[in-house]
Amino acid sequence: MNEVTIYTDGGCSGNPGPGGWGVVVIFNGEAKQLSGGEKNTTNNRMELTAAINALSIVKNTKEFSGLPVKINIDSQYVKNGITVWIKNWKLKGWKTADKKPVKNQDLWIQLDELNSALDVSWNWVKGHAGIEYNEICDQLCQKEIAKNR
């Protein structure tokens, strides 16, 4: 069975500061790139935005309907948030273990909706370790940061 493979990255210059994100979607040996950015944001918001945009592409592409998705991400924050922490955040009214509001709740809600609608497996990859598509995502991210300075 076919699978959609995704790599994502996000970051910024200064935190907060100008930020960018990059995505590579791979299907049937073809890799498509997507990127974007913001003038004033945080690393975590850009990591989340990358994942949201990647999964939105999958959800809205008829050819990908019903296929499993493997998302490779170098952000432990996003991987742990969507696979572990989010269940308790929702049960506790979007509060953390120490009863503080969850940061980036708006983005977590979007990511959760997409993750729930698709068959997604989340895989952490080490950033800046020479993994080809992760490096491409980083380059896309850096170009967007430069555009938003």
Which ranges hold each PLM region?
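RNase H-like nuclease fold core
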Residues: M1-R45, S56-K59, L67, Q139-R149
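RNase H catalytic domain
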Residues: G11-N15, I52-I136, L140, E144-I145
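Short, conserved alpha-helix that lines the donor NDP-sugar binding/gating region
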Residues: E47, A51
